[in-house]
């Protein structure tokens, strides 16, 4: 679609999705990209650039006393909004501790909350997640919370004051895409806060499916960082998100069991 | 001899670390062979705000954590 054309039903003239508003902030891109698992800073920077993202997730870890190497030292912090995660935390207390350290690191009040329940699946601990969400919101944090695809938990997290609820499409890093589109649709229908699909994206079509379901955005890391060509995959993810966003608003056709001719059935030669 | 008695052990990022008496948090951070983007310091599970790094003196047996921002998803 050219930039001079107008999307029906939308007063804006554009060829990209509208910006995403979360709490009191607006982000130009709905694709949130993780900064983990890159082999080198050059590839990371090129992939982030190709993805068009504004929000990048980061982790808080002990400094490596034996090596000063840190890819993030080469990240252009002026260009991106850093969203610290609590990855690796298996209880609410540890997650809250990481959020407070993040604040001390100068990263502000925005956090991606993860309280994990199991090392093999990395699925969230719903009880610890809810507890940490409540406490962090009370402490003034803006909490974007990683959740399972359970619609009841998603509602509880919204009630606890989450800025965004981020259900997993499938387990973190699994590349299985969207496994339970029914549950995700229910979550999307029920919640008022923006829902971002987080985790499990394997390839571009997964992002499109998430957006077609009605997600406000997608967060991914391994799908890009682990691809053979991360920069090309980042490019694909960006366009997949746009495709899904437009498709969700375009009004798709109904599915039918049998064919329906696309060309006129009248005036066929030989009849 | 006196040097020896002026040194003591702390836990730094989970490992035993020797420091001189009267070392401040700021001294410790500056002595580390690291070039982090930013650091935050915890002393015995309590954050030491950056504004207090210079005046906070580390004591024997303290558990010090020095953390930074790294790549993550």
Annotate the PLM regions.
Chain B
Residues 1-72:
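Ubiquitin-like/PB1-type beta-grasp interaction modules and other compact soluble beta-rich domains
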């Amino acid at each position: 679609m050219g930039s001079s054309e107008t999307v029906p039903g939308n007063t804006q003239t554009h060829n990209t999705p509208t910006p995403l508003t979360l709490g009191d902030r607006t982000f130009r891109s709905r694709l949130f990209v993780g900064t983990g698992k890159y082999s080198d800073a050059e590839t990371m920077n090129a992939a982030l650039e190709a993805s068009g993202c504004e929000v990048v997730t980061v982790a808080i870890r002990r400094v490596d006393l034996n090596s000063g190497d840190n890819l993030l030292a080469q990240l252009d912090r002026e260009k991106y909004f850093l969203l610290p995660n609590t990855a690796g935390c298996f209880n609410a207390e540890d997650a809250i501790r990481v959020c407070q350290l993040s604040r001390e690191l100068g990263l502000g009040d925005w956090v991606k909350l993860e309280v994990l329940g199991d090392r093999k699946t990395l699925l969230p601990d719903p009880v610890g997640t809810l507890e940490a969400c409540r406490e962090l919101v009370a402490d003034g944090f803006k909490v974007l919370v990683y959740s399972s695809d359970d619609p009841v938990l998603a509602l509880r997290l919204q009630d606890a004051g989450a800025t965004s609820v981020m259900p997993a499409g499938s387990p973190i890093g699994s590349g299985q895409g969207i496994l339970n589109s029914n549950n995700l649709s229910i979550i999307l229908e029920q919640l008022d806060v923006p829902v971002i699909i987080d985790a499990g994206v394997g390839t571009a079509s997964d992002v499109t499916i998430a957006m077609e379901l009605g997600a406000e955005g997608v967060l991914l890391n391994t799908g890009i960082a682990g691809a053979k060509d991360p920069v090309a995959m980042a490019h694909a993810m960006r366009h997949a998100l746009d495709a899904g966003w437009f498709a969700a608003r375009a009004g798709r056709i109904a599915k039918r069991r049998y064919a329906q001719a696309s060309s006129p059935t009248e005036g066929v030669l030989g009849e | 001899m006196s040097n020896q008695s002026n040194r003591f052990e702390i836990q730094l990022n989970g490992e035993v670390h020797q420091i001189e008496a009267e070392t401040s948090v700021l001294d410790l951070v500056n002595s580390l062979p690291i070039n982090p983007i930013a650091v935050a310091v915890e002393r015995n599970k309590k954050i030491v705000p950056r504004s207090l790094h210079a005046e906070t003196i580390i004591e024997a047996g303290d558990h010090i954590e020095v953390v930074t921002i790294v790549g993550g998803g």
